[in-house]
């Protein structure tokens, strides 16, 4: 019986425990401190969130202690901050002190403790929102209308003493808009907002934040209605500007229609014409540069020609045959009407020396004293001395050459083909003569040649007849040019040229007066082996004389003359007392025919004396 009673008691106890477990009673859950806030950095409040109560009434207690202390304190005020909060008054708040705070939950089934929270009052400041938010639309006279926003700092914050420094932020939007427009105002408590839409109702809010802390909540919304005539004045101004611009445009169109030409002339003045006297604008437009330059008195462009035809187109013909018909000894036996030729260092005709810088440099370096000259006497008189009457027998070929070729005196330096003016001569005859004068010259020279070939002896009568022929030549050239002297400048060491002596034959005369020449190789039995084809010259050439059968003898000017060769040849063949001056010159030059042709870096000219040996 006693055993049954004991088992019954155990069963009832187990049943009671199961009933209590089925009702959910347990120890409380762990609470959580989620926020601590100080509105003015003098007091602060902490809030927690409780855990599960276990089906039983639960008691919550907040305890704290300061860092470095062991004494634990309980919350001084559970009511000021609201439920589940603890308020710390100024008495219990310290700056620059760290608080270690915990929350304890206790019921009949047990207790639990929250995680500790470390709080520094300086960094948990969250002020209240600003107060007395005011909105106003202002219309200044000199500027556009704008929205004027004003507010006051929170009441609890001591801003005047500088205990806290607040910064403000404003946001606004139209009433029906979804997004806010935010403006940062800084530390000022007023702000201007521009560019508002007329007729709209705007909502405005403001908030603040300390230097170290959090933004406050937004203040309550404030609204304002923007009037419809907010931009009417601007529209009126634009309408006025448009009307005024239209009137100005109409006035300008009317003025242009009445005085269009005058206004165009005033805005775009015409280009002034040329002020030069005698200037023809038509020549400038047509592009005729020759006529335009001649109008200014300028020289025309030099003639252009193919370099292959320079020998024919720019052949220089010298028809002063009278000078070359007279032998060199006429200098010693000149008549009373003969005037001595003045010495001139150079008289460049402009044809040869322009293309020969070496000749010009040589002439500048050579001394110019005592040059030898050729003379052309006007009258040939009979010599008074008996030895001048001695007769000599010459062959016809020698007579022809004596009458046609000028000779160098033995004591002269070197022959030159540069013409010089006589003392009484003031104008220079052009080297390019008329075709009629050239024909007259060729006829007269041909006649002289034939008369010279018919004579067999040289006598006094022959000398007089020769003078008569010379006068005929002078009369044929009286219209063309005056007598020209030939200067013999001093020489420099020569360069012996291996080129053979050449002749040219007149092929035809074109309408411009230019001579077409055919090169003709010299025909001499003893010089045939040395003759060669003449090189094509791209320089100017000078004609020494015109022989029979229309053959021109080309004269080329050597760069220098070897005086030593001439003197040596003179010593080897000394002249006899009965010889005249012409025979002396002939004997001195006939000893060195191969050395007569010299060459220099400029133009290649031939000395007339060199033909004496080649024509035998």
Swiss-Prot record:
**Gene3D superfamilies the UniProt entry points to:** Immunoglobulins
> What keywords appear on the UniProt entry?
Disulfide bond, Glycoprotein, Membrane, Metal-binding, Receptor, Repeat, Signal, Transmembrane, Transmembrane helix, Zinc
Q: What is known of its domains?
A: The WSXWS motif appears to be necessary for proper protein folding and thereby efficient intracellular transport and cell-surface receptor binding. The box 1 motif is required for JAK interaction and/or activation.
User: What protein name does the entry list?
Assistant: Prolactin receptor
Q: Where, by residue number, does Zn(2+) bind?
A: 211-212
Question: Do you know which Pfam families this protein is assigned to?
Answer: EpoR_lig-bind
Taken from the record's topology, the Cytoplasmic segments are 259-616
Q: Which GO terms describe its cellular component?
A: external side of plasma membrane; receptor complex
Q: What InterPro entries has UniProt attached to this entry?
A: FN3_dom, FN3_sf, Growth/epo_recpt_lig-bind, Ig-like_fold, Long_hematopoietin_rcpt_CS, Type-I_Cytokine_Rcpt
Q: Which gene encodes it?
A: PRLR
Glycosylated residues, chain numbering: 59, 104, 132
Q: Does the keyword Transmembrane apply?
A: yes
For the motif Box 1 motif, what are the positions?
267-275
Give the protein's biological function.
Answer: This is a receptor for the anterior pituitary hormone prolactin.
Query: This protein's superkingdom?
Result: Eukaryota
Residue span of motif WSXWS motif: 215-219
Spell out the family assignment given in the record's similarity comment: Belongs to the type I cytokine receptor family. Type 1 subfamily.
An annotated GO BP: positive regulation of cell population proliferation
Entry keyword annotation includes Membrane: yes
Membrane association type: Single-pass type I membrane protein
Q: Which GO terms describe its molecular function?
A: cytokine binding; metal ion binding; peptide hormone binding; prolactin receptor activity
Organism of derivation = Oryctolagus cuniculus (Rabbit)
Task: Give the UniProt subcellular location, in the record's own words.
Answer: Membrane
Quaternary assembly: Interacts with SMARCA1. Interacts with NEK3 and VAV2 and this interaction is prolactin-dependent.
Query: Where does the record place the Fibronectin type-III domain?
Result: 27-128, 129-229
Region listing for Disordered, in residue ranges:
326-375, 454-492, 568-593
Residue intervals on the Extracellular side: 25-234
